[in-house]
Protein backbone atom coordinates (compact mmCIF):
# COMPACT_ATOMS: atom_id res chain seq x y z
CA UNK A 1 0.00 0.00 0.00
CA UNK A 2 1.48 3.35 -0.99
CA UNK A 3 1.02 6.25 1.40
CA UNK A 4 0.90 9.97 0.82
CA UNK A 5 0.81 13.00 3.10
CA UNK A 6 -1.66 15.80 2.58
CA UNK A 7 -2.80 18.94 4.41
CA UNK A 8 -6.57 18.65 4.67
CA UNK A 9 -8.00 20.78 7.46
CA UNK A 10 -10.00 23.87 6.56
CA UNK A 11 -9.12 25.97 9.62
CA UNK A 12 -5.70 24.72 10.66
CA UNK A 13 -3.09 22.37 9.29
CA UNK A 14 -3.25 18.71 10.22
CA UNK A 15 -0.86 16.33 8.52
CA UNK A 16 -2.54 12.99 7.94
CA UNK A 17 -1.12 9.85 6.39
CA UNK A 18 -3.52 8.43 3.83
CA UNK A 19 -3.88 5.64 1.33
CA UNK A 20 -3.11 6.38 -2.31
CA UNK A 21 -4.19 4.67 -5.51
CA UNK A 22 -0.88 5.43 -7.26
CA UNK A 23 -2.82 5.95 -10.49
CA UNK A 24 -0.96 6.83 -13.66
CA UNK A 25 -1.57 10.40 -14.91
CA UNK A 26 -3.80 11.27 -17.83
CA UNK A 27 -2.59 9.91 -21.15
CA UNK A 28 -4.21 12.70 -23.11
CA UNK A 29 -3.62 16.00 -21.33
CA UNK A 30 -4.35 18.87 -23.74
CA UNK A 31 -4.39 16.64 -26.83
CA UNK A 32 -8.01 17.28 -27.77
CA UNK A 33 -7.69 21.05 -27.45
CA UNK A 34 -6.09 20.89 -30.89
CA UNK A 35 -9.52 20.04 -32.33
CA UNK A 36 -11.25 23.18 -31.04
CA UNK A 37 -11.35 24.77 -34.50
CA UNK A 38 -11.88 21.53 -36.38
CA UNK A 39 -14.49 21.94 -39.08
CA UNK A 40 -17.19 19.41 -39.72
CA UNK A 41 -17.83 17.81 -43.08
CA UNK A 42 -17.49 20.23 -45.97
CA UNK A 43 -20.27 20.78 -48.47
CA UNK A 44 -18.91 18.12 -50.81
CA UNK A 45 -18.64 15.51 -48.06
CA UNK A 46 -22.13 16.31 -46.79
CA UNK A 47 -23.57 15.88 -50.28
CA UNK A 48 -21.65 12.65 -50.82
CA UNK A 49 -22.86 11.37 -47.46
CA UNK A 50 -26.49 12.19 -48.30
CA UNK A 51 -26.21 10.61 -51.75
CA UNK A 52 -24.75 7.41 -50.32
CA UNK A 53 -27.40 7.36 -47.61
CA UNK A 54 -30.16 7.50 -50.21
CA UNK A 55 -28.55 4.71 -52.23
CA UNK A 56 -28.47 2.49 -49.15
CA UNK A 57 -32.05 3.45 -48.28
CA UNK A 58 -33.15 2.29 -51.74
CA UNK A 59 -31.29 -1.00 -51.26
CA UNK A 60 -33.07 -1.50 -47.95
CA UNK A 61 -36.52 -0.69 -49.33
CA UNK A 62 -36.06 -2.75 -52.50
CA UNK A 63 -34.83 -5.94 -50.80
CA UNK A 64 -37.72 -8.46 -50.61
CA UNK A 65 -39.32 -8.47 -47.16
CA UNK A 66 -39.15 -12.22 -46.61
CA UNK A 67 -35.64 -12.77 -47.96
CA UNK A 68 -32.25 -13.68 -46.54
CA UNK A 69 -30.98 -10.72 -48.56
CA UNK A 70 -33.02 -8.37 -46.36
CA UNK A 71 -31.79 -10.01 -43.15
CA UNK A 72 -28.16 -9.79 -44.18
CA UNK A 73 -28.51 -6.21 -45.38
CA UNK A 74 -30.00 -5.11 -42.05
CA UNK A 75 -27.25 -6.96 -40.20
CA UNK A 76 -24.52 -5.38 -42.32
CA UNK A 77 -26.00 -1.89 -41.89
CA UNK A 78 -26.10 -2.40 -38.12
CA UNK A 79 -22.57 -3.79 -37.93
CA UNK A 80 -21.25 -0.87 -40.03
CA UNK A 81 -22.73 1.57 -37.51
CA UNK A 82 -25.22 3.00 -40.01
CA UNK A 83 -28.52 1.81 -38.51
CA UNK A 84 -29.27 5.17 -36.88
CA UNK A 85 -29.86 6.62 -40.37
CA UNK A 86 -32.52 4.02 -41.21
CA UNK A 87 -34.25 3.30 -37.93
CA UNK A 88 -37.80 3.61 -39.24
CA UNK A 89 -37.07 1.36 -42.25
CA UNK A 90 -35.37 -1.24 -40.04
CA UNK A 91 -38.16 -1.08 -37.45
CA UNK A 92 -40.75 -1.67 -40.16
CA UNK A 93 -38.81 -4.58 -41.66
CA UNK A 94 -38.25 -6.28 -38.31
CA UNK A 95 -41.89 -5.79 -37.36
CA UNK A 96 -42.85 -7.62 -40.56
CA UNK A 97 -40.38 -10.40 -39.79
CA UNK A 98 -41.80 -10.77 -36.30
CA UNK A 99 -45.36 -11.24 -37.57
CA UNK A 100 -44.09 -13.71 -40.20
CA UNK A 101 -41.51 -15.43 -38.00
CA UNK A 102 -42.68 -18.94 -38.87
CA UNK A 103 -41.71 -18.33 -42.50
CA UNK A 104 -38.17 -17.49 -41.42
CA UNK A 105 -37.86 -20.50 -39.11
CA UNK A 106 -37.74 -23.02 -41.95
CA UNK A 107 -34.45 -21.97 -43.55
CA UNK A 108 -30.88 -23.07 -42.91
CA UNK A 109 -28.97 -22.50 -39.67
CA UNK A 110 -27.53 -19.14 -40.70
CA UNK A 111 -30.89 -17.69 -41.82
CA UNK A 112 -32.81 -18.90 -38.75
CA UNK A 113 -30.14 -17.80 -36.28
CA UNK A 114 -29.71 -14.41 -37.95
CA UNK A 115 -33.45 -13.71 -37.96
CA UNK A 116 -33.79 -14.88 -34.36
CA UNK A 117 -30.93 -12.66 -33.18
CA UNK A 118 -32.07 -9.56 -35.08
CA UNK A 119 -35.57 -9.87 -33.63
CA UNK A 120 -34.48 -10.48 -30.05
CA UNK A 121 -31.95 -7.68 -30.34
CA UNK A 122 -34.85 -5.42 -31.31
CA UNK A 123 -36.87 -6.48 -28.26
CA UNK A 124 -39.13 -9.06 -29.91
CA UNK A 125 -39.45 -12.29 -27.96
CA UNK A 126 -39.49 -15.16 -30.48
CA UNK A 127 -39.36 -18.87 -29.72
CA UNK A 128 -36.08 -20.76 -29.82
CA UNK A 129 -37.87 -23.98 -30.83
CA UNK A 130 -36.75 -23.39 -34.42
CA UNK A 131 -33.29 -24.65 -33.41
CA UNK A 132 -34.58 -28.10 -32.40
CA UNK A 133 -34.31 -29.24 -36.02
CA UNK A 134 -30.53 -28.94 -35.69
CA UNK A 135 -30.32 -31.37 -32.75
CA UNK A 136 -30.21 -35.18 -32.72
CA UNK A 137 -32.37 -37.64 -30.79
CA UNK A 138 -30.30 -37.04 -27.65
CA UNK A 139 -30.95 -33.31 -27.85
CA UNK A 140 -27.37 -32.47 -28.78
CA UNK A 141 -26.50 -30.26 -31.73
CA UNK A 142 -25.51 -32.29 -34.78
CA UNK A 143 -21.78 -32.56 -35.41
CA UNK A 144 -22.28 -31.95 -39.13
CA UNK A 145 -23.15 -28.32 -38.36
CA UNK A 146 -19.45 -27.54 -37.93
CA UNK A 147 -19.14 -27.59 -41.73
CA UNK A 148 -21.34 -24.47 -41.85
CA UNK A 149 -18.98 -21.96 -40.26
CA UNK A 150 -21.19 -18.98 -41.08
CA UNK A 151 -24.17 -20.74 -39.53
CA UNK A 152 -22.16 -21.63 -36.43
CA UNK A 153 -21.12 -18.02 -35.95
CA UNK A 154 -24.73 -16.86 -36.39
CA UNK A 155 -25.94 -19.45 -33.86
CA UNK A 156 -23.28 -18.32 -31.38
CA UNK A 157 -24.42 -14.70 -31.68
CA UNK A 158 -28.10 -15.69 -31.43
CA UNK A 159 -27.59 -17.77 -28.28
CA UNK A 160 -26.23 -14.71 -26.45
CA UNK A 161 -29.79 -13.36 -26.25
CA UNK A 162 -31.08 -16.28 -24.19
CA UNK A 163 -33.27 -16.05 -21.10
CA UNK A 164 -33.86 -18.36 -18.14
CA UNK A 165 -35.12 -21.84 -18.98
CA UNK A 166 -33.90 -21.92 -22.59
CA UNK A 167 -31.72 -25.00 -22.32
CA UNK A 168 -31.36 -25.35 -26.07
CA UNK A 169 -29.70 -21.92 -26.25
CA UNK A 170 -27.44 -22.75 -23.30
CA UNK A 171 -26.40 -25.86 -25.23
CA UNK A 172 -26.02 -23.84 -28.43
CA UNK A 173 -23.66 -21.41 -26.75
CA UNK A 174 -21.46 -24.14 -25.28
CA UNK A 175 -21.49 -26.07 -28.57
CA UNK A 176 -20.58 -23.11 -30.77
CA UNK A 177 -17.85 -21.79 -28.45
CA UNK A 178 -16.18 -25.20 -28.35
CA UNK A 179 -16.47 -25.87 -32.08
CA UNK A 180 -15.53 -22.37 -33.27
CA UNK A 181 -12.35 -22.52 -31.19
CA UNK A 182 -11.54 -25.87 -32.82
CA UNK A 183 -12.30 -24.55 -36.30
CA UNK A 184 -10.22 -21.37 -36.02
CA UNK A 185 -6.73 -22.82 -36.65
CA UNK A 186 -7.99 -24.62 -39.77
CA UNK A 187 -9.60 -21.62 -41.48
CA UNK A 188 -7.91 -20.45 -44.66
CA UNK A 189 -10.14 -17.37 -44.80
CA UNK A 190 -8.22 -14.88 -42.65
CA UNK A 191 -11.06 -12.33 -42.68
CA UNK A 192 -13.53 -14.88 -41.30
CA UNK A 193 -10.96 -16.08 -38.76
CA UNK A 194 -10.47 -12.51 -37.51
CA UNK A 195 -14.22 -12.03 -37.27
CA UNK A 196 -14.70 -15.24 -35.26
CA UNK A 197 -11.78 -14.40 -32.95
CA UNK A 198 -13.32 -11.01 -32.24
CA UNK A 199 -16.82 -12.46 -31.79
CA UNK A 200 -15.62 -15.01 -29.24
CA UNK A 201 -14.27 -12.18 -27.11
CA UNK A 202 -16.82 -9.47 -27.96
CA UNK A 203 -20.16 -10.95 -29.09
CA UNK A 204 -22.63 -8.52 -30.64
CA UNK A 205 -24.66 -8.58 -27.41
CA UNK A 206 -21.72 -7.02 -25.57
CA UNK A 207 -20.36 -4.78 -28.32
CA UNK A 208 -19.83 -1.01 -28.07
CA UNK A 209 -21.19 0.32 -31.36
CA UNK A 210 -18.31 2.64 -32.28
CA UNK A 211 -15.63 0.13 -31.31
CA UNK A 212 -17.24 -2.73 -33.21
CA UNK A 213 -18.04 -0.47 -36.17
CA UNK A 214 -14.36 0.35 -36.60
CA UNK A 215 -13.45 -3.34 -36.54
CA UNK A 216 -16.30 -4.42 -38.81
CA UNK A 217 -15.43 -1.88 -41.48
CA UNK A 218 -12.02 -3.55 -41.68
CA UNK A 219 -13.54 -7.05 -41.78
CA UNK A 220 -16.08 -5.97 -44.39
CA UNK A 221 -13.44 -4.39 -46.62
CA UNK A 222 -11.53 -7.69 -46.68
CA UNK A 223 -14.66 -9.55 -47.73
CA UNK A 224 -14.47 -10.05 -51.49
CA UNK A 225 -18.26 -9.83 -51.73
CA UNK A 226 -18.56 -6.46 -50.02
CA UNK A 227 -20.85 -3.77 -51.41
CA UNK A 228 -18.75 -0.73 -52.30
CA UNK A 229 -21.59 1.73 -51.68
CA UNK A 230 -22.07 0.42 -48.15
CA UNK A 231 -18.33 0.44 -47.50
CA UNK A 232 -17.85 3.99 -48.77
CA UNK A 233 -20.83 5.24 -46.76
CA UNK A 234 -19.60 3.53 -43.59
CA UNK A 235 -16.11 5.05 -43.87
CA UNK A 236 -17.33 8.55 -44.62
CA UNK A 237 -19.99 8.48 -41.92
CA UNK A 238 -17.52 7.15 -39.35
CA UNK A 239 -15.11 10.00 -40.04
CA UNK A 240 -17.83 12.67 -40.00
CA UNK A 241 -19.02 11.45 -36.60
CA UNK A 242 -15.45 11.23 -35.33
CA UNK A 243 -14.93 14.90 -36.16
CA UNK A 244 -17.98 15.79 -34.06
CA UNK A 245 -16.74 13.64 -31.19
CA UNK A 246 -13.30 15.29 -31.33
CA UNK A 247 -14.90 18.71 -31.05
CA UNK A 248 -16.97 17.55 -28.09
CA UNK A 249 -13.84 16.29 -26.37
CA UNK A 250 -12.16 19.60 -27.06
CA UNK A 251 -15.02 21.33 -25.22
CA UNK A 252 -14.76 18.83 -22.38
CA UNK A 253 -10.99 19.33 -22.11
CA UNK A 254 -11.46 23.09 -21.73
CA UNK A 255 -14.01 22.45 -18.98
CA UNK A 256 -11.62 20.02 -17.28
CA UNK A 257 -8.71 22.49 -17.38
CA UNK A 258 -10.85 25.29 -16.03
CA UNK A 259 -11.76 23.29 -12.92
CA UNK A 260 -8.19 22.20 -12.12
CA UNK A 261 -9.61 19.43 -9.95
CA UNK A 262 -6.78 17.06 -10.76
CA UNK A 263 -4.09 19.40 -9.43
CA UNK A 264 -6.12 19.86 -6.25
CA UNK A 265 -6.94 16.15 -5.83
CA UNK A 266 -3.80 14.21 -6.82
CA UNK A 267 -5.19 10.96 -5.37
CA UNK A 268 -8.04 10.83 -7.90
CA UNK A 269 -7.91 9.11 -11.29
CA UNK A 270 -7.55 11.71 -14.04
CA UNK A 271 -9.69 10.03 -16.68
CA UNK A 272 -11.71 12.65 -18.55
CA UNK A 273 -11.22 11.07 -21.99
CA UNK A 274 -12.00 7.62 -20.61
CA UNK A 275 -15.21 9.04 -19.06
CA UNK A 276 -16.14 10.49 -22.43
CA UNK A 277 -15.44 7.12 -24.10
CA UNK A 278 -17.82 5.49 -21.60
CA UNK A 279 -20.52 8.00 -22.47
CA UNK A 280 -19.86 7.63 -26.19
CA UNK A 281 -20.57 3.95 -25.73
CA UNK A 282 -23.94 4.91 -24.30
CA UNK A 283 -24.94 6.90 -27.38
CA UNK A 284 -22.81 8.13 -30.28
CA UNK A 285 -25.43 9.76 -32.51
CA UNK A 286 -25.04 13.47 -33.34
CA UNK A 287 -28.40 14.48 -31.84
CA UNK A 288 -27.12 13.48 -28.38
CA UNK A 289 -24.11 15.79 -28.35
CA UNK A 290 -25.37 17.91 -25.44
CA UNK A 291 -26.48 14.80 -23.55
CA UNK A 292 -23.03 13.21 -23.94
CA UNK A 293 -21.28 16.24 -22.50
CA UNK A 294 -23.65 16.38 -19.53
CA UNK A 295 -23.15 12.68 -18.87
CA UNK A 296 -19.37 12.98 -19.15
CA UNK A 297 -19.26 15.71 -16.52
CA UNK A 298 -21.30 13.70 -14.04
CA UNK A 299 -19.27 10.55 -14.81
CA UNK A 300 -16.08 12.46 -14.06
CA UNK A 301 -17.44 13.50 -10.67
CA UNK A 302 -18.57 9.95 -9.89
CA UNK A 303 -14.99 8.81 -10.47
CA UNK A 304 -13.56 11.51 -8.18
CA UNK A 305 -16.08 10.85 -5.41
CA UNK A 306 -15.51 7.10 -5.72
CA UNK A 307 -11.76 7.58 -5.20
CA UNK A 308 -12.43 9.91 -2.27
CA UNK A 309 -14.49 7.28 -0.46
CA UNK A 310 -12.39 4.30 -1.57
CA UNK A 311 -8.87 5.41 -0.74
CA UNK A 312 -8.46 8.96 0.54
CA UNK A 313 -11.15 10.23 2.86
CA UNK A 314 -11.11 9.53 6.58
CA UNK A 315 -14.35 8.26 8.10
CA UNK A 316 -15.11 11.51 9.93
CA UNK A 317 -14.58 13.48 6.70
CA UNK A 318 -16.72 11.04 4.72
CA UNK A 319 -19.47 11.41 7.30
CA UNK A 320 -19.44 15.18 6.80
CA UNK A 321 -19.38 14.87 3.00
CA UNK A 322 -22.29 12.41 3.03
CA UNK A 323 -24.29 14.79 5.21
CA UNK A 324 -23.47 17.69 2.88
CA UNK A 325 -24.64 15.72 -0.17
CA UNK A 326 -27.89 14.93 1.64
CA UNK A 327 -28.43 18.63 2.33
CA UNK A 328 -27.48 19.65 -1.25
CA UNK A 329 -26.92 23.27 -0.34
CA UNK A 330 -23.77 25.32 -0.84
CA UNK A 331 -23.88 26.36 2.82
CA UNK A 332 -23.24 22.72 3.75
CA UNK A 333 -19.72 23.01 2.34
CA UNK A 334 -18.59 25.15 5.28
CA UNK A 335 -18.19 22.11 7.50
CA UNK A 336 -15.99 20.28 4.98
CA UNK A 337 -12.20 20.04 4.78
CA UNK A 338 -10.75 22.12 1.95
CA UNK A 339 -10.33 19.35 -0.63
CA UNK A 340 -13.94 18.24 -0.11
CA UNK A 341 -15.22 21.81 -0.37
CA UNK A 342 -13.73 21.99 -3.86
CA UNK A 343 -15.40 18.74 -4.95
CA UNK A 344 -18.73 19.73 -3.42
CA UNK A 345 -18.87 23.24 -4.84
CA UNK A 346 -17.81 22.15 -8.33
CA UNK A 347 -20.37 19.33 -8.28
CA UNK A 348 -23.20 21.70 -7.36
CA UNK A 349 -22.01 24.14 -10.02
CA UNK A 350 -22.19 21.44 -12.71
CA UNK A 351 -25.73 20.53 -11.71
CA UNK A 352 -26.68 24.22 -11.74
CA UNK A 353 -25.32 24.48 -15.31
CA UNK A 354 -27.30 21.42 -16.38
CA UNK A 355 -30.45 22.80 -14.79
CA UNK A 356 -30.07 26.10 -16.65
CA UNK A 357 -29.49 24.29 -19.94
CA UNK A 358 -32.61 22.17 -19.49
CA UNK A 359 -34.66 25.22 -18.48
CA UNK A 360 -34.77 26.21 -22.16
CA UNK A 361 -36.92 23.12 -22.77
CA UNK A 362 -38.89 23.45 -19.51
CA UNK A 363 -37.17 20.27 -18.32
CA UNK A 364 -35.11 21.63 -15.43
CA UNK A 365 -37.27 19.74 -12.91
CA UNK A 366 -35.81 16.47 -14.23
CA UNK A 367 -32.41 17.32 -12.73
CA UNK A 368 -33.79 16.37 -9.32
CA UNK A 369 -33.96 12.75 -10.46
CA UNK A 370 -30.22 12.77 -11.13
CA UNK A 371 -29.49 14.56 -7.85
CA UNK A 372 -31.51 11.98 -5.91
CA UNK A 373 -29.55 9.18 -7.56
CA UNK A 374 -26.28 10.95 -6.74
CA UNK A 375 -27.34 10.95 -3.10
CA UNK A 376 -27.99 7.20 -3.29
CA UNK A 377 -24.55 6.59 -4.80
CA UNK A 378 -22.86 8.55 -2.02
CA UNK A 379 -24.86 6.63 0.60
CA UNK A 380 -23.63 3.41 -0.99
CA UNK A 381 -20.02 4.58 -0.98
CA UNK A 382 -20.39 5.64 2.66
CA UNK A 383 -21.76 2.21 3.59
CA UNK A 384 -18.67 0.60 2.03
CA UNK A 385 -16.44 3.01 3.95
CA UNK A 386 -18.14 2.04 7.22
CA UNK A 387 -17.62 -1.64 6.40
CA UNK A 388 -13.96 -0.94 5.72
CA UNK A 389 -13.28 1.08 8.86
CA UNK A 390 -15.33 -1.40 10.90
CA UNK A 391 -13.34 -4.29 9.38
CA UNK A 392 -16.59 -5.95 8.33
CA UNK A 393 -17.05 -8.30 5.38
CA UNK A 394 -20.79 -8.22 4.59
CA UNK A 395 -22.89 -11.13 3.38
CA UNK A 396 -23.35 -11.31 -0.39
CA UNK A 397 -27.00 -10.30 -0.08
CA UNK A 398 -26.04 -7.14 1.81
CA UNK A 399 -23.23 -6.39 -0.59
CA UNK A 400 -25.35 -6.84 -3.71
CA UNK A 401 -28.15 -4.69 -2.31
CA UNK A 402 -25.65 -1.88 -1.72
CA UNK A 403 -24.13 -2.53 -5.16
CA UNK A 404 -27.27 -1.13 -6.80
CA UNK A 405 -26.07 2.23 -5.50
CA UNK A 406 -22.28 1.82 -5.77
CA UNK A 407 -22.46 0.74 -9.40
CA UNK A 408 -23.72 4.30 -10.06
CA UNK A 409 -25.61 2.90 -13.05
CA UNK A 410 -29.05 4.22 -12.10
CA UNK A 411 -27.42 7.63 -11.72
CA UNK A 412 -25.77 7.28 -15.13
CA UNK A 413 -29.01 6.06 -16.72
CA UNK A 414 -31.03 8.92 -15.26
CA UNK A 415 -28.41 11.49 -16.28
CA UNK A 416 -28.08 10.03 -19.77
CA UNK A 417 -31.79 10.72 -20.39
CA UNK A 418 -31.82 14.36 -19.25
CA UNK A 419 -31.07 15.91 -22.65
CA UNK A 420 -32.63 13.29 -24.91
CA UNK A 421 -35.65 15.44 -25.69
CA UNK A 422 -39.36 14.74 -25.42
CA UNK A 423 -38.91 10.98 -25.53
CA UNK A 424 -37.66 11.15 -21.92
CA UNK A 425 -40.87 11.95 -20.02
CA UNK A 426 -41.43 12.24 -16.28
CA UNK A 427 -42.96 8.75 -16.36
CA UNK A 428 -39.72 7.11 -17.51
CA UNK A 429 -37.75 8.84 -14.75
CA UNK A 430 -40.33 7.65 -12.22
CA UNK A 431 -39.99 4.13 -13.65
CA UNK A 432 -36.20 3.93 -13.33
CA UNK A 433 -36.35 5.39 -9.80
CA UNK A 434 -38.33 2.30 -8.70
CA UNK A 435 -35.26 0.17 -9.46
CA UNK A 436 -36.93 -2.24 -11.93
CA UNK A 437 -35.41 -5.68 -12.41
CA UNK A 438 -33.84 -4.79 -15.78
CA UNK A 439 -31.97 -1.86 -14.24
CA UNK A 440 -30.93 -3.82 -11.16
CA UNK A 441 -29.51 -6.55 -13.42
CA UNK A 442 -27.41 -3.92 -15.19
CA UNK A 443 -26.18 -2.53 -11.84
CA UNK A 444 -25.17 -5.96 -10.63
CA UNK A 445 -23.38 -6.86 -13.86
CA UNK A 446 -21.20 -3.74 -13.74
CA UNK A 447 -20.47 -4.19 -10.01
CA UNK A 448 -19.43 -7.84 -10.37
CA UNK A 449 -17.41 -7.32 -13.56
CA UNK A 450 -15.51 -4.49 -11.88
CA UNK A 451 -14.87 -6.55 -8.75
CA UNK A 452 -13.55 -9.56 -10.66
CA UNK A 453 -10.73 -7.63 -12.32
CA UNK A 454 -9.93 -5.05 -9.65
CA UNK A 455 -10.30 -6.74 -6.27
CA UNK A 456 -6.70 -7.98 -5.96
CA UNK A 457 -5.22 -4.55 -6.62
CA UNK A 458 -7.77 -2.91 -4.34
CA UNK A 459 -7.06 -5.31 -1.48
CA UNK A 460 -3.34 -4.53 -1.74
CA UNK A 461 -3.97 -0.85 -1.12
CA UNK A 462 -6.62 -1.48 1.54
CA UNK A 463 -10.10 -1.14 0.05
CA UNK A 464 -13.37 -2.43 1.41
CA UNK A 465 -14.24 -6.05 0.62
CA UNK A 466 -15.43 -6.67 -2.93
CA UNK A 467 -17.93 -9.31 -4.05
CA UNK A 468 -15.05 -11.77 -4.34
CA UNK A 469 -14.02 -11.42 -0.69
CA UNK A 470 -17.67 -11.44 0.40
CA UNK A 471 -18.33 -14.68 -1.46
CA UNK A 472 -15.12 -16.34 -0.27
CA UNK A 473 -15.85 -15.39 3.33
CA UNK A 474 -19.50 -16.44 3.32
CA UNK A 475 -19.11 -19.75 1.50
CA UNK A 476 -15.56 -20.71 2.57
CA UNK A 477 -14.29 -21.14 -0.98
CA UNK A 478 -11.06 -20.26 -2.76
CA UNK A 479 -10.61 -17.14 -4.86
CA UNK A 480 -10.71 -19.25 -8.03
CA UNK A 481 -13.97 -20.89 -6.98
CA UNK A 482 -15.47 -17.50 -6.15
CA UNK A 483 -14.49 -16.19 -9.58
CA UNK A 484 -16.20 -19.12 -11.33
CA UNK A 485 -19.37 -18.68 -9.28
CA UNK A 486 -19.48 -14.93 -9.83
CA UNK A 487 -19.10 -15.46 -13.59
CA UNK A 488 -22.17 -17.71 -13.41
CA UNK A 489 -24.03 -15.05 -11.43
CA UNK A 490 -23.19 -12.46 -14.11
CA UNK A 491 -24.56 -14.77 -16.81
CA UNK A 492 -27.79 -15.11 -14.85
CA UNK A 493 -28.08 -11.35 -14.53
CA UNK A 494 -27.68 -11.08 -18.31
CA UNK A 495 -30.58 -13.51 -18.65
CA UNK A 496 -32.59 -11.30 -16.29
CA UNK A 497 -31.72 -8.26 -18.38
CA UNK A 498 -32.68 -9.97 -21.66
CA UNK A 499 -35.92 -11.30 -20.17
CA UNK A 500 -36.99 -7.93 -18.79
CA UNK A 501 -36.04 -6.20 -22.05
CA UNK A 502 -38.56 -8.39 -23.86
CA UNK A 503 -41.25 -7.63 -21.27
CA UNK A 504 -40.98 -3.83 -21.18
CA UNK A 505 -43.79 -1.95 -22.90
CA UNK A 506 -41.80 0.14 -25.37
CA UNK A 507 -44.71 2.51 -25.85
CA UNK A 508 -44.25 3.58 -22.23
CA UNK A 509 -40.45 3.13 -22.04
CA UNK A 510 -39.18 3.78 -25.58
CA UNK A 511 -36.48 1.48 -26.94
CA UNK A 512 -34.04 4.37 -27.42
CA UNK A 513 -34.05 4.88 -23.63
CA UNK A 514 -33.73 1.18 -22.86
CA UNK A 515 -30.71 1.06 -25.15
CA UNK A 516 -28.94 3.54 -22.87
CA UNK A 517 -29.20 0.97 -20.07
CA UNK A 518 -28.06 -1.87 -22.31
CA UNK A 519 -25.23 0.16 -23.83
CA UNK A 520 -23.97 1.19 -20.40
CA UNK A 521 -23.85 -2.51 -19.54
CA UNK A 522 -21.97 -3.22 -22.77
CA UNK A 523 -19.37 -0.61 -21.91
CA UNK A 524 -18.82 -2.34 -18.57
CA UNK A 525 -18.33 -5.68 -20.35
CA UNK A 526 -15.70 -4.03 -22.53
CA UNK A 527 -13.89 -2.02 -19.85
CA UNK A 528 -13.67 -4.93 -17.42
CA UNK A 529 -13.12 -7.75 -19.91
CA UNK A 530 -9.57 -8.68 -18.86
CA UNK A 531 -8.55 -5.88 -16.51
CA UNK A 532 -9.75 -2.58 -15.06
CA UNK A 533 -9.10 -0.72 -18.31
CA UNK A 534 -10.54 2.50 -16.92
CA UNK A 535 -8.02 2.72 -14.09
CA UNK A 536 -5.14 1.25 -16.12
CA UNK A 537 -6.08 2.84 -19.43
CA UNK A 538 -2.48 2.99 -20.67
CA UNK A 539 -2.45 -0.79 -21.22
CA UNK A 540 -5.07 -1.44 -23.92
CA UNK A 541 -7.77 1.21 -23.82
CA UNK A 542 -5.46 3.92 -25.15
CA UNK A 543 -5.20 2.20 -28.55
CA UNK A 544 -8.96 1.70 -28.74
CA UNK A 545 -9.56 5.37 -27.94
CA UNK A 546 -7.07 6.33 -30.65
CA UNK A 547 -8.98 4.22 -33.18
CA UNK A 548 -12.31 5.75 -32.21
CA UNK A 549 -11.44 9.33 -31.36
CA UNK A 550 -8.11 10.21 -32.98
CA UNK A 551 -7.35 8.32 -36.20
CA UNK A 552 -9.80 8.64 -39.11
CA UNK A 553 -10.42 5.72 -41.45
CA UNK A 554 -8.42 6.15 -44.64
Curated annotation (Swiss-Prot):
Binding-site positions, Mg(2+) 2: 306, 310
InterPro entries referenced in this protein's UniProt entry, alphabetically: Isoprenoid_synthase_dom_sf, Terpene_cyclase-like_1_C, Terpene_cyclase_plant_C1, Terpene_synth_N, Terpene_synth_N_sf, Terpene_synthase-like, Terpene_synthase_metal-bd, Terpenoid_cyclase/PrenylTrfase
GO molecular function, one term: terpene synthase activity
One biological process term in Gene Ontology: terpenoid biosynthetic process
Entry's free-text remark on domains: The Asp-Asp-Xaa-Xaa-Asp/Glu (DDXXD/E) motif is important for the catalytic activity, presumably through binding to Mg(2+).
Function in brief: Sesquiterpene synthase involved in the biosynthesis of volatile compounds. Mediates the conversion of (2E,6E)-farnesyl diphosphate (FPP) into gamma-gurjunene, (E)-beta-farnesene and (+)-valencene, and of (2Z,6Z)-farnesyl diphosphate ((ZZ)-FPP) into (E)-alpha-bergamotene and (Z)-gamma-bisabolene as well as beta-bisabolene, (Z)-alpha-bergamotene and (E)-gamma-bisabolene to a lower extent. Can act with a low efficiency as a monoterpene synthase with geranyl diphosphate (GPP) as substrate, thus producing beta-myrcene, (E)-beta-ocimene, limonene, terpinolene, gamma-terpinene and (Z)-beta-ocimene.
Identification of the protein by name: Terpene synthase 17
Species this chain originates from: Solanum habrochaites (Wild tomato)
Lineage: Eukaryota, Viridiplantae, Streptophyta, Embryophyta, Tracheophyta
UniProt gene name: TPS17
Amino acid sequence: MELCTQTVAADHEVIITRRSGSHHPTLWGDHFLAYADLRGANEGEEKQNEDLKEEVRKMLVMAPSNSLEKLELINTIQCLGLAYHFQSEIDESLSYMYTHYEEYSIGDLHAIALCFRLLRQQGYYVSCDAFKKFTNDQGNFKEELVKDVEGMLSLYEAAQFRVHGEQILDEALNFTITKLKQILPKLSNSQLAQQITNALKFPIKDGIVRVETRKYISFYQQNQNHNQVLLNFAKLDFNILQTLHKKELSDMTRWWKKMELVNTLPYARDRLVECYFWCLGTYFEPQYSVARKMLTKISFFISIIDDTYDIYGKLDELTLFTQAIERWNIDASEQLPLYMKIIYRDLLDVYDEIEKELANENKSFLVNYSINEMKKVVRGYFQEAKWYYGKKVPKMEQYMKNAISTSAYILLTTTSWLAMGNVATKDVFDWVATEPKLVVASCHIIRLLNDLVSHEEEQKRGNAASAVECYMNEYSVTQEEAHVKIRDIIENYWKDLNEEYFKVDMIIIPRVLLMCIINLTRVAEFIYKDEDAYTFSKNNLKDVISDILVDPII
